[in-house]
């Protein structure tokens, strides 16, 4: 038998009606109290209680339950008091049966209440942390909130602020005529074409027009009306494997007509940027950058090729590269010999406007801070990419090896005046840089094996600043 749960009213006349008809446990068939109607008299197992159960037991069940418990403790069955209206045996028997049914129902409700699920409401209390004897700190639990990222968050990032050449970023939005009017550095004419058969990129430097006159650093205007320009060509980001045109003397409209070839795969060439740097070689053997032209090769048809006139824009590079030198070092502990091979150099600065350069290399052994030995290679005529393949040997005991330095200086031969300085590096105890120190360390760990390495030449002032051995040589 099923029972429905209703809310009683605790005041006035309606309280009496609810006590009879709207009590918490009312028979669904006759709407009487469950312990008074005859249709509800059944065994404990046949009673079906529908929940959820109230938090408190009805007052009329509490009173009856207490009476039943007292009677049960005395092992006697208590009977409800007889009503003055009817004291017949049938009425007393009915009341006794009702009392037993009530006690069964009360016991069932009590057992179910003990298993009643807890309330879904969660009472959040502060969490206390702290060591024994220390001041307690109350930490309130916080509500996790989803982070919000504005839509224009990444738009605020400005890559030009992190660019090495951020001053020229606005040039991309200008036309060639606007660039020419703004900077007045002239125009450069060149062409490109890719050879699919041989995997070569051919670059032809044709001419330049309206180059600016050179700037006088000493205030004199003698021989400063015209420039002595030349062009350096490379494929970014690789600036080491560069090419260089000859110097055109005293002209603002030089005609070069020189072709250069870069061995590179087609897909790799499309990822490169062709950089042409226009440089002025003045009478004081100074190399001043006039400007540059940069063209991404993925923006043009390399196979078809083409000719372009491009406006020259300013360059952040104030000094040009001095060139590179390929060396090989080897030490034989048993013989106490330090062997040096001068293999080749490339892209050396020109020291003569008409003939290019006549470069040679001077090798000087410095023991501590004292010059011990000097040797030099032969002079290569009219080239900026000389091949030497010359070997030199120095007597250095093993216990003194850590106290020696090798100074390599590249000069351009000059028959009229003193030789022209091109570049220098120092290897050994007083190295001029980390690449030089790395080469020396690799040689010491090579176990008699020759170690080759390319080195970028440095200026005399830079070497003198970081290497005491550079100050001891001429």
From Swiss-Prot:
Stored SUPFAM superfamilies: C2 domain (Calcium/lipid-binding domain, CaLB) (SSF49562)
Among SMART domains, the record links this protein to: C2 (SM00239)
Q: Does the keyword Hydrolase apply?
A: no
Please name every pair of cysteines joined by a disulfide bond in this record.
none
C2 domain location is: 184-310, 321-455
Residue span of the signal peptide, if any? none
Chain intervals for the UniProt region annotation (Disordered): 54-112
Establish whether keyword Acyltransferase is in the entry.
no
What PANTHER family does UniProt report for this protein, alphabetically?
A: SYNAPTOTAGMIN, SYNAPTOTAGMIN-17
Name of the protein: Synaptotagmin-17
């Amino acid at each position: 038998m099923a029972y429905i749960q209703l809310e009683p009213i605790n005041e006035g006349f309606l309280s009496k009606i609810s006590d009879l008809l709207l009590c918490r446990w009312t028979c669904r068939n006759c709407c009487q109290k469950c312990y008074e109607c005859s249709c509800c008299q059944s065994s404990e197992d046949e009673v079906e209680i529908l929940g959820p159960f109230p938090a408190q037991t009805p007052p009329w069940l509490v009173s009856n339950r207490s009476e039943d418990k007292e009677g049960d403790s005395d092992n006697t069955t208590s009977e409800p008091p007889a009503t003055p209206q009817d004291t017949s045996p049938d009425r007393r028997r009915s009341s006794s049966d009702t009392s037993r049914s009530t006690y069964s129902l009360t016991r069932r409700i009590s057992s179910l209440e003990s298993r009643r699920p807890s309330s879904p409401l969660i009472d959040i209390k502060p969490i206390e942390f702290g060591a024994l004897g220390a001041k307690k700190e109350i930490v309130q639990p916080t509500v996790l909130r989803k982070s919000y990222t504005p839509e224009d968050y990444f738009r605020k990032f400005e890559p030009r602020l992190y660019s090495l050449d951020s001053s020229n970023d606005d040039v991309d939005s200008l036309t060639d005529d606007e660039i020419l009017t703004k900077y007045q550095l002239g125009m450069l004419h060149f062409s490109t074409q890719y050879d699919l058969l041989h995997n070569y990129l051919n670059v032809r430097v044709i001419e330049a027009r309206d180059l600016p006159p050179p700037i006088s650093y000493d205030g004199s205007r003698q021989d400063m009306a015209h420039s002595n320009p030349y062009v350096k060509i490379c494929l970014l980001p690789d600036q080491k494997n560069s090419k260089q045109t000859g110097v055109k003397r005293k002209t603002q409209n030089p005609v070069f007509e020189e072709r250069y070839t870069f061995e590179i795969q087609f897909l790799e060439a499309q990822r490169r940027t062709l950089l042409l740097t226009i440089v002025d070689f003045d009478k004081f053997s100074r190399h001043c950058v006039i400007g540059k032209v940069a063209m991404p090769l993925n923006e043009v048809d390399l196979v078809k090729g083409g000719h372009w006139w491009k406006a020259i824009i300013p360059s952040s590079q104030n000094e040009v590269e001095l060139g590179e030198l390929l060396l090989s070092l080897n030490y034989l502990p048993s013989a106490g010999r330090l062997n040096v091979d001068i293999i080749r150099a490339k892209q050396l600065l020109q020291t003569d406007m008409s003939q290019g350069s006549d470069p040679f290399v001077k090798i000087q052994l410095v023991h501590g801070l004292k010059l011990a030995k000097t040797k030099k290679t032969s002079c290569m005529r009219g080239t900026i990419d000389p091949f030497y393949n010359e070997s030199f040997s120095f007597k250095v005991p093993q216990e003194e090896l850590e106290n020696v330095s090798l100074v390599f200086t590249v000069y351009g031969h000059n028959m009229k005046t003193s030789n022209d300085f091109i570049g220098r590096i120092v290897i050994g105890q007083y190295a001029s840089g980390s690449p030089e120190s790395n080469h020396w360390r690799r040689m010491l760990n090579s176990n008699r094996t020759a170690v080759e390495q390319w080195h970028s030449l440095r200026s005399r002032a830079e070497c003198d600043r970081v290497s005491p051995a550079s100050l001891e040589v001429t």
